[in-house]
Protein backbone atom coordinates (compact mmCIF):
# COMPACT_ATOMS: atom_id res chain seq x y z
CA UNK A 1 0.00 0.00 0.00
CA UNK A 2 1.27 3.49 -0.85
CA UNK A 3 1.28 6.09 1.91
CA UNK A 4 0.78 9.34 -0.02
CA UNK A 5 1.63 11.40 3.06
CA UNK A 6 5.28 10.29 2.88
CA UNK A 7 5.71 10.72 -0.88
CA UNK A 8 7.19 13.74 -2.57
CA UNK A 9 4.98 15.66 -5.00
CA UNK A 10 6.69 13.99 -7.98
CA UNK A 11 6.29 10.54 -6.42
CA UNK A 12 2.63 11.25 -5.67
CA UNK A 13 1.94 12.25 -9.28
CA UNK A 14 3.80 9.16 -10.54
CA UNK A 15 1.77 6.92 -8.20
CA UNK A 16 -1.51 8.46 -9.30
CA UNK A 17 -0.66 8.31 -13.03
CA UNK A 18 -1.61 4.64 -13.13
CA UNK A 19 -5.17 5.67 -12.22
CA UNK A 20 -5.37 8.39 -14.88
CA UNK A 21 -8.32 8.32 -17.24
CA UNK A 22 -7.38 9.02 -20.82
CA UNK A 23 -8.41 12.43 -22.13
CA UNK A 24 -7.66 13.63 -25.63
CA UNK A 25 -6.54 17.21 -25.05
CA UNK A 26 -7.55 18.08 -28.60
CA UNK A 27 -11.13 17.95 -27.25
CA UNK A 28 -10.44 20.66 -24.65
CA UNK A 29 -11.70 23.57 -26.80
CA UNK A 30 -14.93 21.74 -27.67
CA UNK A 31 -15.49 20.76 -24.04
CA UNK A 32 -15.04 24.35 -22.88
CA UNK A 33 -17.36 25.56 -25.65
CA UNK A 34 -20.08 23.19 -24.41
CA UNK A 35 -19.58 24.24 -20.79
CA UNK A 36 -19.81 27.88 -21.85
CA UNK A 37 -23.12 27.16 -23.61
CA UNK A 38 -24.54 25.70 -20.40
CA UNK A 39 -23.23 28.54 -18.25
CA UNK A 40 -24.40 31.21 -20.70
CA UNK A 41 -27.88 29.66 -20.84
CA UNK A 42 -28.20 30.00 -17.05
CA UNK A 43 -30.09 26.69 -17.13
CA UNK A 44 -28.32 24.00 -15.14
CA UNK A 45 -31.09 21.50 -15.80
CA UNK A 46 -33.96 21.11 -18.24
CA UNK A 47 -32.13 23.25 -20.77
CA UNK A 48 -31.13 22.74 -24.39
CA UNK A 49 -27.99 20.79 -23.51
CA UNK A 50 -29.85 18.42 -21.18
CA UNK A 51 -32.46 17.77 -23.86
CA UNK A 52 -29.68 17.06 -26.38
CA UNK A 53 -28.02 14.67 -23.92
CA UNK A 54 -31.30 12.85 -23.21
CA UNK A 55 -31.94 12.47 -26.92
CA UNK A 56 -28.43 11.18 -27.69
CA UNK A 57 -28.30 8.87 -24.66
CA UNK A 58 -31.76 7.46 -25.39
CA UNK A 59 -30.89 6.83 -29.04
CA UNK A 60 -27.62 5.13 -28.11
CA UNK A 61 -29.35 2.87 -25.55
CA UNK A 62 -32.55 2.47 -27.58
CA UNK A 63 -34.50 3.54 -24.47
CA UNK A 64 -36.32 6.62 -23.28
CA UNK A 65 -33.98 8.78 -21.19
CA UNK A 66 -34.57 11.36 -18.48
CA UNK A 67 -31.52 13.13 -17.07
CA UNK A 68 -31.27 13.87 -13.35
CA UNK A 69 -28.68 15.87 -11.44
CA UNK A 70 -27.74 12.76 -9.44
CA UNK A 71 -28.34 9.05 -9.13
CA UNK A 72 -30.08 9.75 -5.81
CA UNK A 73 -32.65 12.00 -7.45
CA UNK A 74 -33.32 9.47 -10.19
CA UNK A 75 -33.64 6.60 -7.72
CA UNK A 76 -36.04 8.54 -5.49
CA UNK A 77 -38.19 9.41 -8.51
CA UNK A 78 -38.28 5.74 -9.56
CA UNK A 79 -39.15 4.63 -6.03
CA UNK A 80 -41.92 7.22 -5.80
CA UNK A 81 -43.27 6.09 -9.18
CA UNK A 82 -43.19 2.47 -7.99
CA UNK A 83 -45.18 3.34 -4.86
CA UNK A 84 -42.86 1.73 -2.33
CA UNK A 85 -43.92 3.62 0.83
CA UNK A 86 -44.72 0.99 3.46
CA UNK A 87 -43.54 -1.82 1.17
CA UNK A 88 -40.42 -4.00 1.03
CA UNK A 89 -37.56 -3.42 -1.41
CA UNK A 90 -34.88 -5.99 -2.16
CA UNK A 91 -31.35 -4.60 -2.35
CA UNK A 92 -28.07 -6.35 -3.19
CA UNK A 93 -25.63 -6.69 -0.31
CA UNK A 94 -22.78 -5.43 -2.52
CA UNK A 95 -23.67 -1.81 -3.24
CA UNK A 96 -22.95 1.69 -2.03
CA UNK A 97 -24.87 2.70 1.10
CA UNK A 98 -26.96 5.20 -0.88
CA UNK A 99 -28.99 2.35 -2.39
CA UNK A 100 -30.61 1.09 0.84
CA UNK A 101 -30.66 4.57 2.41
CA UNK A 102 -32.73 5.93 -0.48
CA UNK A 103 -35.18 3.07 -0.11
CA UNK A 104 -35.53 3.95 3.57
CA UNK A 105 -35.92 7.63 2.65
CA UNK A 106 -38.76 6.62 0.32
CA UNK A 107 -40.52 4.97 3.26
CA UNK A 108 -39.77 1.37 2.35
CA UNK A 109 -38.36 -1.52 4.36
CA UNK A 110 -35.08 -2.94 2.99
CA UNK A 111 -34.18 -6.61 2.79
CA UNK A 112 -30.74 -7.54 1.50
CA UNK A 113 -29.99 -10.18 -1.12
CA UNK A 114 -26.68 -12.03 -1.20
CA UNK A 115 -24.34 -11.58 -4.15
CA UNK A 116 -22.44 -14.10 -6.26
CA UNK A 117 -18.69 -14.51 -6.00
CA UNK A 118 -18.20 -14.74 -9.76
CA UNK A 119 -19.80 -11.41 -10.75
CA UNK A 120 -20.24 -9.65 -7.37
CA UNK A 121 -23.86 -8.98 -8.34
CA UNK A 122 -27.20 -10.17 -6.96
CA UNK A 123 -27.62 -13.94 -6.59
CA UNK A 124 -30.73 -15.22 -8.35
CA UNK A 125 -31.08 -18.14 -5.91
CA UNK A 126 -31.15 -15.81 -2.90
CA UNK A 127 -33.27 -13.26 -4.78
CA UNK A 128 -35.90 -15.90 -5.56
CA UNK A 129 -35.97 -17.03 -1.92
CA UNK A 130 -36.32 -13.42 -0.67
CA UNK A 131 -39.07 -12.68 -3.22
CA UNK A 132 -41.17 -15.54 -1.85
CA UNK A 133 -40.39 -14.69 1.78
CA UNK A 134 -40.85 -10.89 1.67
CA UNK A 135 -43.16 -10.20 -1.32
CA UNK A 136 -41.34 -6.98 -2.31
CA UNK A 137 -42.87 -4.12 -4.26
CA UNK A 138 -39.53 -3.27 -5.91
CA UNK A 139 -35.94 -4.44 -6.25
CA UNK A 140 -32.62 -2.86 -7.09
CA UNK A 141 -30.10 -4.72 -9.20
CA UNK A 142 -26.66 -3.11 -9.33
CA UNK A 143 -24.34 -3.96 -12.22
CA UNK A 144 -20.87 -3.93 -10.63
CA UNK A 145 -17.42 -3.62 -12.14
CA UNK A 146 -18.20 -2.68 -15.73
CA UNK A 147 -20.37 -5.67 -16.61
CA UNK A 148 -24.01 -6.67 -16.47
CA UNK A 149 -25.12 -8.94 -13.60
CA UNK A 150 -24.74 -12.49 -14.91
CA UNK A 151 -28.21 -13.52 -13.69
CA UNK A 152 -30.11 -10.41 -14.83
CA UNK A 153 -32.32 -12.38 -17.22
CA UNK A 154 -33.64 -14.66 -14.46
CA UNK A 155 -34.02 -11.75 -12.02
CA UNK A 156 -35.93 -9.66 -14.57
CA UNK A 157 -38.19 -12.55 -15.55
CA UNK A 158 -39.09 -13.29 -11.93
CA UNK A 159 -39.82 -9.58 -11.40
CA UNK A 160 -42.17 -9.61 -14.41
CA UNK A 161 -43.97 -12.74 -13.19
CA UNK A 162 -44.30 -11.45 -9.60
CA UNK A 163 -45.12 -7.82 -10.50
CA UNK A 164 -41.95 -6.44 -8.88
CA UNK A 165 -40.74 -3.03 -10.09
CA UNK A 166 -37.10 -3.56 -11.11
CA UNK A 167 -34.65 -0.65 -10.87
CA UNK A 168 -31.30 -1.20 -12.59
CA UNK A 169 -28.31 0.78 -11.32
CA UNK A 170 -26.04 0.90 -14.36
CA UNK A 171 -23.57 3.53 -13.15
CA UNK A 172 -20.72 1.00 -13.32
CA UNK A 173 -21.77 -0.55 -16.62
CA UNK A 174 -22.46 2.12 -19.24
CA UNK A 175 -22.42 0.35 -22.59
CA UNK A 176 -21.95 -3.12 -21.10
CA UNK A 177 -23.89 -5.89 -22.82
CA UNK A 178 -25.15 -9.33 -21.85
CA UNK A 179 -26.46 -11.68 -24.53
CA UNK A 180 -26.81 -8.79 -26.98
CA UNK A 181 -28.66 -6.44 -24.61
CA UNK A 182 -27.30 -3.38 -22.88
CA UNK A 183 -27.38 -2.70 -19.17
CA UNK A 184 -30.59 -0.87 -18.31
CA UNK A 185 -32.81 -2.72 -20.78
CA UNK A 186 -34.23 -5.32 -18.38
CA UNK A 187 -35.68 -3.15 -15.65
CA UNK A 188 -38.58 -0.75 -15.31
CA UNK A 189 -36.21 2.09 -14.48
Where are these regions (language model features)?
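Conserved PLP-binding active-site segment in aminotransferase class I/II-type PLP enzymes
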Residues: 1-84
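Conserved PLP-anchoring active-site segment centered on the Schiff-base-forming lysine
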Residues: 76-134
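Acidic active-site catalytic centers that drive phospho-/nucleotidyl reactions
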Residues: 54, 114-116, 168-169
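Generic structural signal for small/hydrophobic residues in well-ordered secondary structure
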Residues: 35, 57, 74, 89, ...
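A generic structural signal for well-ordered alpha-helical segments
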Residues: 57-58, 103, 159
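Glycine-rich phosphate-binding loop at the start of an alpha helix
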Residues: 68, 72, 93, 97, ...
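Active-site phosphate-binding strand-loop segment of PLP-dependent enzymes
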Residues: 120-188
Amino acid sequence: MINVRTLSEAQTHASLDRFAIGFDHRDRARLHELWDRVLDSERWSEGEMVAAFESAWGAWNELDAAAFASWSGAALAALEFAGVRGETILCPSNTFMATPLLALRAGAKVEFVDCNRDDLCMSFADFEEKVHRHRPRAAFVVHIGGHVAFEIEQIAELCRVEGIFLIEDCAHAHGAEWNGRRAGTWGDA
